[in-house]
Amino acid sequence: MKVRHVMGMSLAGVFLLAISLAAANTDVADAAMRKDRAALQALLQKGANVNAAQADGARAIHWAVYNGDLEMTKMLIGAGADVKVANRDGSTPLWLASTNGDAAIIRVLLDAGANANEVLPLGRTPLMLASRTGALDAMRVLIDRGANLNARDSERGTTPMMWAADQGHAAAVRLLVERGADLAARSAPAARGRGPALGKSNDPRASVKRQVEAVIAEQGQLPDLSQLRAAGNNNGGGARGNANANAANNNDGDDQADAAAAFGGGGGRGRQAQTDGGQLTPLIYAARANSLETVRVLLDAGADINQVSGYGWSPLLVATQNRFYLLGKYLLERGANVNLANKGGWTPLYLATDNRNIEGGDYPVRPTDMDDLEYIKLLLAKGADVNARMIDSSETRTVFTNQWLDERGATAFLRASQSGDLQLMKLLLEHGADPKITTDLKVTALQVAAGIGWVEGITSERSKEETLEAVRLLLDLGLDPNAQALTGRVALHGAGHKGATEVVKLLVSRGAKMDVRDWGNTDNRGSPELAAHTWLPVDYADGLVRVGVQSAIAHPETGRVFRELMKQAGLDPPAEGRTLDSICIVEICSIDYKPN
């Protein structure tokens, strides 16, 4: 026992000694970290290990370079410091010097054997880091020592020029141009997959969608409602029949609702593709950075002003999307194509219209650097196509709006109508806008002006008064107040949902029918019966119809006006005070059915 006790004490002593020696080994790095040149010199004179690492792998040379201490760096190199060593994160002394843009230390490190083309984590190079910093002298040293001007990182395939352009370092970009860097280089394609495609499935709704697309291919337009009715299996149930909660077993025979669902559920859906696509160029990076001077350098050097990214983002689209209107103006003056759209069909005119009436909720909104209406006038003066139609929903549309307003096929005029932007609507009309162009789901400008797609607290509206006048304008232009979208909704459904009482009165006075039902709302979950129920405009006003994830909001005054107008029209209005929890709605009521 005695011997074992002594051995235990000896082992403990060895362990403590090892800890003490390990701690002592960091003294050189610690002194450099403290910027204590005298202590460091004393340690080196005693033969301390110049390459001893701290816990994170940092050596004295890392700290000297990081602190920008040229004399300490030279001292450590003279004592044998490894200029190529990396810490645990992969940072080398040259990485740190390049990030700092320290030309003098970069030169010393290269003289001591560092590699100007060393590959750092994620494939980055010292020249990329110096370019991001915009340090011209540091860049020159690296380039003079053979740094690859067109090296690409392994994460996004970006080059030094892209790093400089992204930070708006015009002088750094000019230097790279002068040294022969590739102006037309592109970053790698986006690694993320595209969104869900609307393809074949076992859902009968997909079959309906294919039938609709066949008509589009043959006739160049969507089928009218009579064609969709004829496509049904005539089981008599329609949207009020026995709906199955499982869409794959949907045999309700209501192909109108199925067509709407195939094109996006309750009338809306999110974007169908990722909107970056990768393949950005230095010019697109410069536009995204709102660096007019960098854009100027690249254009003067011969960059194509209409080059596009993988998704089709041109410099003008990027500038417009980000509200950099002065840059957009400059690009237009240099000859940018005002009608060049990306894969979503988004044009500068549509994006500027959307920006003027931006939704709240999902995106922080920067102020424009130029009056938005003046910018739109500039686009129009350059020949913007006022009737260009969207292919995909815009990037700023919130999930709430996407769930019941599908922007495919929309024009800038329809988008302006959604926000009751009377001034812009009139401007677009003056330039040839066709007010009767609908979305692919047959949603009209009148419907969105009345409230289809309205989300409380999200949708932008110029004013209630202006919206009323916008609705009046659309009626005067001949838009049909009883036109139904492929969801079955009419303008009155939107006005009821929004609680736009004066709009309701105006629409009814111009012939809007109050007994028109939609074709069922897939967003009323609760029960299959409720999901299949069809709704009157007054039901929307009573807050019985939920659209997407937004809550249904009751508008008692609008409901009261609906009932008065229905009585005047000889219609039997539903009882007041209805709620889904307390009453049984006639069409879905049965003896043994009790709403949840």
Which residues fall in each region the model found?
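Ankyrin repeat A-helix N-terminal signature
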Residues: 30-34, 63-69, 96-102, 129-135, ...
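Ankyrin repeat boundary signal
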Residues: 52-53, 83-86, 116-119, 149-153, ...
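Conserved ankyrin/ankyrin-like repeat signature
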Residues: 39, 71-72, 104-105, 137-138, ...
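Ankyrin repeat domain, specifically the short helix-to-loop turn at the C-terminus of the second helix
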Residues: 44-49, 74-82, 107-115, 140-148, ...
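Ankyrin repeat start-site detector
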Residues: 56, 88-89, 121-122, 155-156, ...
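Bacterial N-terminal signal peptides
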Residues: 9-20
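Disordered, low-complexity segments in secreted/periplasmic proteins that are enriched in proline
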Residues: 192-274, 581-596
